[in-house]
C-alpha cells in the first residue's frame, strides 16, 4: 500500500504538468446529452440510426423505453418513449448535425420519401447561409425539427 501512494502522486503530478484535461481543469460546462420524449420509440430509433446515421450506445435502464446515441465524444442523444401524442414544434428549436455532403444527404432523404426544405420553407431546396454553409430542415417522426448542414468548423 505504501508503494502505491507515491505512484499515485506521481501519476497526478504528471497529469497536471502535461496538461491532460481533467474535470477540475475544465472552466466551462460541457453538453452531456439532449433528451427527446417520443411517441414511438422504435420508429424514432430507426430514424436517428438509419436516416441520420448516428450510432446507438448502451443505455443503463434496459427497460425498453430508452435508446441512446453517441453524437460527439462526450455528448449523447437520448430518445425516451412515453409521449401521448406527436406535437408540432417550431423550426427555431431544432437539432443540427453536420455531414460531409448535404447533396448526398438530400438524396438519402428523397430515397426514403422524407420531405425537406430551406429555412424559408421552400420544398426540396437547401439554404446557403451568409457564411457559405449549406443547410436543410425536416422533421423527425415526432415533429422535432432537424437541420443538416455541411459546416466543417
Predicted regions located by residue number:
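A short acidic/small-residue loop/turn micro-motif
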Residues: 152-153
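Vicinal oxygen chelate
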Residues: 40-42, 95-142
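Exposed loop/turn and edge beta-strand positions of beta-sandwich/beta-sheet ligand-binding modules
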Residues: 63, 91, 132-133
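N-terminal beta-strand motif that seeds the catalytic metal site of vicinal oxygen chelate
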Residues: 23-42, 93-95
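Core segments of cupin and vicinal oxygen chelate
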Residues: 35-76
Amino acid at each position: 500500500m505504501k508503494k502505491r501512494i507515491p505512484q499515485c502522486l506521481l501519476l497526478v503530478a504528471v497529469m497536471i504538468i502535461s496538461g491532460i484535461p481533467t474535470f477540475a481543469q475544465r472552466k466551462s460546462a460541457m453538453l452531456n446529452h439532449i433528451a427527446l420524449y417520443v411517441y414511438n420509440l422504435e420508429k424514432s430509433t430507426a430514424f436517428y440510426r438509419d436516416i441520420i446515421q448516428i450510432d446507438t450506445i448502451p443505455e443503463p435502464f434496459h427497460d425498453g423505453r430508452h435508446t441512446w446515441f453517441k453524437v460527439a465524444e462526450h455528448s449523447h442523444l437520448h430518445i425516451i418513449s412515453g409521449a401521448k401524442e406527436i406535437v408540432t414544434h417550431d423550426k427555431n428549436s431544432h437539432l443540427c448535425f453536420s455531414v460531409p455532403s448535404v447533396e448526398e444527404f438530400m438524396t438519402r432523404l428523397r430515397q426514403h420519401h422524407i420531405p425537406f426544405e430551406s429555412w424559408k420553407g421552400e420544398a426540396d431546396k437547401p439554404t446557403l447561409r451568409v457564411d457559405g454553409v449549406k443547410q436543410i430542415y425536416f422533421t423527425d417522426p415526432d415533429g422535432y425539427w432537424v437541420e443538416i448542414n455541411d459546416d466543417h468548423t
